[in-house]
UniProtKB/Swiss-Prot annotation:
Residues 1-10, 106-115 have a biased composition (Basic and acidic residues). The keyword Secreted does not apply. Its main location: nucleus. Belongs to the taxilin family. This is Gamma-taxilin. Binds to the C-terminal coiled coil region of syntaxin family members STX1A, STX3A and STX4A. Forms a heterodimer with ATF4 in osteoblasts. The keyword NAD does not apply. GO terms for cellular component: cytosol; nuclear membrane. The lineage of its organism: Eukaryota, Metazoa, Chordata, Craniata, Vertebrata. Pfam families: Taxilin.
Length: 524
């Protein structure tokens, strides 16, 4: 039977594998990994549904085959259990399929990825075909396994085992579902956190972009100003060159006109040449200065760009440091709270100790004031007092040793007292029992006395007759003897109990020995 059940479970596993392969074949065309994970989960869920349908069909077939008149009650009972199990499995299957559908929708909606696999109708038809195939195979395997069994009880036992296995599998699936739901909640929280961080990064990026735009505008304004200055300088240079050419033309005209004054004007020409050289040198120096200014501006722009990159990197590093410092500060805050609570408790304890020490210090101050008064009044007797103090210290040491010994003795006495209290309680219980016995004996004695009085009255009535004088004396004597024997036995019993109680109470304390004697006297 075990081998048949193993074959059935293997066939069931094969059916689930085929269903999973069919599901994978339906989604294998799509390139992303999300669809492959979805097909795996869908194949698992299809396998669970196939298992549940297989169990329901097998239980229904078994109930229809073995519904004999002799075991009608048992079959009804098992059929009800099978219906409940099938309802439970179908509910779990619907739950799993609904959760899977919601997860698949959540995975597919944000990405908006194009599906290359077959449509949903074809997938449903393929799943239904796979289910029918696996159901047919598992039903055939179950029927073969159940036909091998001889009695219906064995078949029911096999079905019960199979039902228990399916219940365990469904519970495991529920546990996995709970774990997956928790993971999904964690992932959603992480997603929200990442979205918030992303929004913060976007805001920082927008701020940096605005700063960069402002810097670019500033650079553009600087470039325009530099260009305007260069244009103005070029215009000035052109005006100077034009003016210089005009002056040269005038000089040439004057030279042509004043050939006579060449000798006189040579010196002036030399001076003018020197001035021109100076002007040319100044112009060259100005051009070099302008080139240097342009180069300096370009270097400044490069430096600004490098500084921007450095600032972006520094901002990123500052954000990371800020996060680290925040985590570190949170940890320090929790630790400081714990330390604060501990310090509060220590403060309360120290305040209590301070109050005690203050009381002791006040007592000490009072004693010191008294000792100061005594010191002022008895300075002459200080030497004697020192000797007495030494003696008293020795005596205090002796008294301390005695006190310690007395404490030990007190502890021993307390232990003995607890033992004696227990014994006293036991004796009280025994005394209560003795009192109950005495009361019972007294009631019996009273009853016997009443009976004796009744018998005496009867004997006196009979003695009134003359014929029965001699036999009447005999029962009276018998009654008197019976009375005396009963009294003697009661007295002996009570004396023995009283002696035992007195002996035990004599070993106890006088307080505990007084109460049992009073109880005995009250009983007497």
């Amino acid at each position: 039977m075990a081998t048949r059940l193993e074959e059935v479970t293997r066939g069931r596993g094969g059916g689930t594998e085929e269903a999973s392969e069919g599901g994978r074949g339906g989604r294998r065309r799509s390139p992303p990994q999300k669809f492959e994970i979805g097909t795996m989960e869908e194949a698992r869920i299809c396998g669970l549904g196939v298992k549940a349908d297989m169990v329901c069909n097998s239980q229904a077939n078994d109930i229809l085959q073995h519904q004999d008149p002799s075991c009608g009650g048992t079959t009804k009972k098992h059929s009800l259990e099978g219906d409940e199990g099938s309802d439970f499995i179908t509910k779990n299957r619907n739950l799993v399929s609904s959760v899977f559908c919601t997860q698949e929708k959540r995975e597919e909606i944000p990405g908006r990825e194009a599906r290359t696999g077959p449509p949903d109708g074809q997938q449903d038809s393929e799943c239904s075909r796979n289910k029918e195939k696996t159901l047919g195979k598992e039903v055939l395997l179950l029927m073969q396994a159940l036909n091998t069994l001889s009695t219906p009880e064995e078949k029911l036992a096999a079905l019960c085992k199979k039902y228990a296995d399916l219940l365990e599998e469904s519970r495991n699936v529920q546990k996995q579902m709970k774990i997956l739901q928790k993971k999904q909640a964690q992932i959603v929280k992480e997603k929200v956190h990442l979205q918030s961080e992303h929004s913060k990064a976007i805001l920082a990026r927008s701020k940096l972009e605005s700063l960069c735009r402002e810097l670019q505008r500033h650079n553009k304004t600087l470039k325009e100003e530099n260009m305007q200055q260069a244009r103005e300088e070029e215009e000035r240079r052109k005006e100077a060159t034009a003016h210089f050419q005009i002056t040269l033309n005038e000089i040439q005209a004057q030279l042509e006109q004043h050939d006579i004054h060449n000798a006189k004007l040579r010196q002036e020409n030399i001076e003018l040449g020197e001035k021109l050289k100076k002007l040319i040198e100044q112009y060259a120096l100005r051009e070099e200065h302008i080139d240097k200014v342009f180069k300096h501006k370009e270097l400044q722009q490069q430096l600004v760009d490098a500084k921007l990159q450095q600032t972006t990197q520094l901002i990123k590093e500052a954000d990371e440091k800020h996060q680290r410092e925040r985590e570190f500060l949170l940890k320090e805050a929790t630790e400081s709270r714990h330390k604060y609570e501990q310090m509060k408790q220590q403060e309360v304890q120290l305040k209590q100790q301070l109050s005690l020490y203050m009381d002791k210090f006040e007592e000490f101050q009072t004693t010191m004031a008294k000792s100061n008064e005594l010191f002022t009044t008895f300075r002459q007797e200080m030497e004697k007092m020192t000797k007495k103090i030494k003696k008293l210290e020795k005596e205090t040491i002796i008294w301390r040793t005695k006190w310690e010994n007395n404490n030990k003795a007190l502890l021993q006495m307390a232990e003995e007292k607890t033992v004696r209290d227990k014994e006293y309680k036991a004796f009280q219980i025994k005394l209560e029992r003795l009192e109950k016995l005495c009361r019972a004996l007294q009631t019996e004695r009273n009853e016997l006395n009443e009976k004796v009085e009744v018998l005496k009255e009867q004997v006196s009535i009979k003695a009134a007759d003359g014929d029965l004088v001699s036999p009447a004396t005999q029962p009276c004597a018998v009654l008197d003897s019976f009375k005396e024997t009963s009294r003697r036995t009661l007295g002996m019993h009570l004396e023995a109990r009283a002696k035992s109680v007195c002996e035990k109470s004599a070993a106890q304390k006088p307080s505990s020995s007084g109460s049992p004697a009073q109880g005995i006297e009250s009983v007497d």
